[in-house]
């Protein structure tokens, strides 16, 4: 008998949530849009874990009417209320990340009816980040409280956040005729100034970080150019196309993974790195052997020849892949970012690119300073004739150095494919900036290239919002011209006796 009773109670316990789900669903389907909105507001103010499946079905548009094949039709207002109700229910989740996301959603959409529930959740919340997010959501609602002391506390809390939404709320509170209490208005003005100051700091840091990521691409492009230009004195106008070929090599590797190893698609950028390096290095060495070697000492002919080669490479890519941009997707481990400030997110792909660029710089320095090839390159750079007299195969060194520079540019193309569009004209956007980096940093100087690349990248990103991209580039170019007139050797000059 006890066993039978236990089974009966267990069956009732299992059926109760299903009955509640069915009852809420029937009430919602039977109601008109106005009544449905009231139901959603009630559910948001009084969350019930048994109702989350119903709200999830509504959110995904999977709730159908009995006897009909079509799904329930919802207007935009109802969809917004469904999102708010879902956020309220997700505050009951055990996962702190889910609660944090829900609290951030409620900062934008919470209704006054949810005030009591949010207050209860805030009192029992142990996670610091979720607690802070809930405090902000609660403060947004308390701005319309009848008690001036509550409004004053809410205004002061908003001033500590530095959130863009807080600025909007405070600006609304300071509209004529909105807030009658003088103390609250004064506190709102102070808090608004604090929020604007914090937002400005976040914007400046964001621009600096974007500049560093742009500088990383310029560094990878200019690093190879510094080697070839510093060693051979060749103005290679096709160097930007090595970036483009590296990006298209990444695209081809992605296609191969999609077709033959879709289960390992997340790792395609790691395979694309050596592929892009060897493809562009081989093309660079072939270019040096067939064209540039016969034009040494004739800079104008070299410039025109490499410019023509760049046009040929662009047209070849258009014939093979089409004139439109191709899609290179970020793997999951390069998607998303780190939330540093309310208005500052550092994307993972840009963080990885900056670290990768610095890693390539270290490898290049080791190659040039700790290997026999590097010794030969530095010898030929300082005095080609004397190096040849000492037995250094200058022709072979020229070819390998040109291939190394082109390969590094190919690595830059892999990095660029993760943050920008990949198209036939990709390299044209970076060739001028790459030459500016080389000239500003000092021909053949790695340290100068690093400083110049990051400096130009950050300056570009800071000036763009202020005076526009075109005027920003003009101003930077003018400043570089003035600098070169005063210091023609750039930031760092080559040490030793260099023969021009």
Features from the language model and the residues they span:
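Membrane-embedded helix boundary and interhelical linker motif in transport proteins
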Residues: 239-286, 466
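Pore- or pathway-lining transmembrane helices of multi-pass membrane proteins that form conduits
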Residues: 241-245, 295-318, 357, 426-439, ...
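Alpha-helical transmembrane segments within multi-pass membrane transporters and channels
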Residues: 263-309, 316, 451-456, 487
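Transmembrane alpha-helical segments in multi-pass inner-membrane proteins
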Residues: 269-274, 399-414, 418-480
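Cytosolic-side transmembrane-helix boundaries in multi-pass membrane proteins
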Residues: 295, 301, 305, 325-327, ...
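Helix-loop-helix "hairpin" substructures at the membrane interface of multi-pass membrane proteins
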Residues: 345-422
């Amino acid at each position: 008998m006890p066993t039978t009773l236990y089974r009966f109670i267990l069956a009732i316990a299992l059926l109760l949530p299903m009955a509640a789900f069915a009852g809420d669903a029937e009430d919602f389907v039977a109601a008109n849009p106005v009544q449905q909105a009231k139901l959603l507001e009630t559910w948001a103010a009084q969350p019930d874990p048994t109702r989350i499946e119903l709200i999830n079905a509504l959110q995904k548009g999977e709730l159908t009417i009995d006897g009909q094949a079509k799904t329930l039709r919802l207007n935009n207002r109802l969809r917004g209320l469904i999102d708010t109700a879902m956020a309220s229910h997700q505050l009951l989740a055990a996962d702190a990340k889910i609660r944090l996301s829900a609290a951030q959603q409620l900062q934008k959409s919470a209704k006054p009816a949810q005030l009591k529930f949010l207050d209860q959740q805030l009192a029992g919340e142990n996670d610091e980040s979720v607690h802070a997010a809930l405090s902000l959501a609660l403060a947004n609602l308390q701005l319309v409280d009848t008690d001036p002391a509550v409004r004053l506390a809410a205004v002061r809390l908003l001033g500590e956040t530095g959130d863009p939404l807080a600025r909007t709320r405070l600006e609304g509170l300071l509209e004529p005729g909105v807030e009658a209490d003088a103390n609250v208005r004064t506190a709102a003005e102070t808090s608004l100034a604090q929020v604007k100051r914090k937002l400005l700091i976040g914007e400046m840091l964001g621009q600096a970080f974007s500049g560093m990521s742009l500088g990383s691409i310029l560094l990878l492009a200019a690093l190879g150019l510094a080697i070839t230009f510093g060693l051979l004195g060749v103005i290679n106008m096709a160097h930007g196309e090595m970036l483009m070929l590296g990006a298209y090599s990444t695209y081809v590797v992605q296609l191969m993974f999609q077709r033959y190893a879709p289960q390992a698609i997340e790792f395609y950028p790691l395979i694309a790195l050596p592929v892009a390096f060897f493809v562009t290095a081989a093309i660079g060495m072939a270019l040096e052997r067939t064209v540039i070697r016969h034009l040494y000492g004739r800079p104008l002919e070299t410039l025109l020849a490499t410019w023509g080669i760049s046009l040929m490479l662009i047209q070849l890519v258009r014939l093979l892949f089409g004139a439109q941009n191709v899609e290179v997707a970020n793997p999951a481990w390069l998607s998303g970012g780190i939330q540093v400030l309310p208005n500052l997110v550092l994307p993972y792909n840009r963080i990885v690119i900056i670290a990768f660029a610095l890693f390539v710089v270290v490898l290049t320095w080791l190659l040039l300073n700790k290997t026999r090839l590097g010794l030969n390159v530095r010898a030929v750079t300082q005095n080609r004739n004397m190096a040849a007299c000492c037995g250094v195969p200058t022709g072979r060194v020229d070819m390998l150095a040109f291939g190394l520079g082109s390969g590094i540019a190919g690595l830059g193309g892999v990095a660029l494919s993760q943050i920008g569009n990949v198209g036939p004209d990709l390299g044209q956007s970076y060739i001028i900036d790459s030459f500016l980096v080389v000239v500003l940093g000092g021909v053949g100087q790695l340290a100068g290239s690093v400083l110049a690349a990051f400096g130009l990248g950050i300056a570009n990103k800071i000036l763009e919002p202020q005076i526009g991209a075109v005027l920003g580039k003009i101003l930077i170019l003018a400043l570089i011209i003035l600098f070169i007139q005063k210091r023609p050797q750039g930031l760092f000059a080559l040490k030793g006796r260099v023969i021009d």
